[in-house]
């Protein structure tokens, strides 16, 4: 099942995608595990993510059923690379993103307890986020005050 197949499923289940009111900018997949879609609407009155999910998930549920165990993350396309990288790494909570001068990589700061969420099962979440954004994503874990206090107390 390709990215094109997933796009056709969305065109079937989401009239706004079929009509072009919501555009799927990019799809990246690991079939059977997870897909990430970046969506945008040129109409400020249309929430592209909410439109694709539907009230109570009514639009996304038939797509998920068709895909079996595969999960789908729908992300709003964002012209701010920093925000787009942040959103693409969900469900992880990101503190800060810095895009390299050559715009080929992103350094992402997050709390240590968010690291495994950002990486995902077998590295799939960070891999899909990198493919979706077109950037090499590097995670930088920030130790919390409690972590530092614990290290200090263990040293004495």
Task: Indicate where each model-derived feature is located.
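RNA-contacting regions in translation and RNA-metabolism proteins
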Residues: 1-156
